[in-house]
């Protein structure tokens, strides 16, 4: 085995459960049990120093191994490791958009609640509306915004932009970046009839924010069933 091949393999071998290659596998197995990455959908990526670890495309996320990971150099955007029999994630350009704005982890799910909320918003508020909700305790799990101290409060309004879906995942980047510019305090973007992207400063924050948002989205769907408003 060539020296550079050995170095590439070393990038994904560690006994540390918090190592990105191990952590992505653990997270995706949990996300599968939540129904977020069913049928090979969704993905997760972690930025660790100057390296980006990315789950592959088209694989059963609950069965992934650390050796399935792609590793990219953050500065050059060149792959340092590419598993020969797997495809790079189609989400990669979207993950990069989050990392270029300081994120340490980005999660993409195909949550049913996310999909349903995008349909409800379009029906009730119009094609260009964003998702808005307030006076829900779990909103406290969402940061106020990039560069701001603390999290949103109970009386604050959570806003999550919604972008149109495209035939190919990578083609979402332009509209995703536009939404990031328009809503600079948002840590999530919904994709109509598709799912959601959630990012955070680190893995812990991205995971807990994704959990909080999914909980809020489920509540929002149930509130609509009962005729309850999301905002005053």
Curated annotation (Swiss-Prot):
Active site per the UniProt annotation: 137
Q: What Enzyme Commission number(s) appear in the record? A: 4.2.1.109
Cite the Gene3D superfamilies for this sequence: Class II aldolase/adducin N-terminal domain
Provide the protein's localization: Cytoplasm
Keywords for this protein: Amino-acid biosynthesis, Cytoplasm, Lyase, Metal-binding, Methionine biosynthesis, Zinc
Q: What class of enzyme is it?
A: lyase
An annotated GO cellular component of this protein is: cytoplasm
Binding note for cofactor = Binds 1 zinc ion per subunit.
Q: Transmembrane stretches, by residue range? A: none
GO terms classed as biological process = L-methionine salvage from methylthioadenosine
Part of which pathway? Amino-acid biosynthesis; L-methionine biosynthesis via salvage pathway; L-methionine from S-methyl-5-thio-alpha-D-ribose 1-phosphate: step 2/6
Q: Name one GO molecular function term.
A: methylthioribulose 1-phosphate dehydratase activity
Residues bound to substrate are: 91
Q: InterPro entries from the entry?
A: Aldolase_II/adducin_N (IPR001303), Aldolase_II/adducin_N_sf (IPR036409), MethylthioRu-1-P_deHdtase_MtnB (IPR017714), Salvage_MtnB_euk (IPR027514)
Which metal ions or organic cofactors does this protein require, according to UniProt? Zn(2+)
Q: Binding positions for Zn(2+)?
A: 108, 110, 194
* Catalysed transformations (reactions): 5-(methylsulfanyl)-D-ribulose 1-phosphate = 5-methylsulfanyl-2,3-dioxopentyl phosphate + H2O
What coarse category fits the chief subcellular location reported for this protein? cytoplasm
Task: Write out the function statement from the record.
Answer: Catalyzes the dehydration of methylthioribulose-1-phosphate (MTRu-1-P) into 2,3-diketo-5-methylthiopentyl-1-phosphate (DK-MTP-1-P).
The protein in question is named Methylthioribulose-1-phosphate dehydratase
Lineage here is:
Eukaryota, Fungi, Dikarya, Ascomycota, Pezizomycotina
């Amino acid at each position: 085995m060539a020296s550079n091949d050995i170095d590439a393999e070393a990038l994904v071998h560690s006994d540390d459960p918090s190592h990105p290659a191990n952590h992505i596998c653990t997270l995706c197995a949990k996300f599968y049990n939540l129904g977020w990455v069913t049928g090979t959908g969704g993905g997760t990526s972690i930025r660790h120093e100057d390296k980006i670890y990315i789950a592959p495309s088209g694989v059963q996320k609950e069965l992934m191994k650390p050796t399935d990971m792609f590793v990219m150099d953050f500065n050059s955007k060149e792959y340092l490791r590419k598993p020969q029999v797997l495809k790079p994630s189609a989400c990669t350009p979207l993950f990069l958009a989050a990392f270029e704005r300081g994120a340490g982890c980005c999660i993409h799910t195909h949550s049913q609640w996310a999909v349903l909320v995008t349909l409800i918003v379009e029906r009730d508020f119009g094609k260009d509306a964003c998702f808005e909700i307030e006076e829900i305790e779990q909103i406290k799990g969402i940061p106020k915004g990039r560069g701001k101290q603390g999290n949103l409060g109970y009386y604050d309004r959570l806003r999550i932009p919604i972008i149109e879906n495209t035939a190919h995942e990578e083609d979402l980047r332009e509209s995703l970046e536009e939404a990031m510019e328009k809503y600079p305090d948002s840590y999530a973007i919904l994709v109509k009839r598709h799912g959601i992207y959630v990012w955070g400063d680190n893995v812990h924050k991205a995971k807990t924010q994704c959990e909080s948002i999914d909980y809020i989205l489920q509540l929002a769907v149930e509130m609509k069933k009962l005729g309850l408003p999301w905002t005053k």
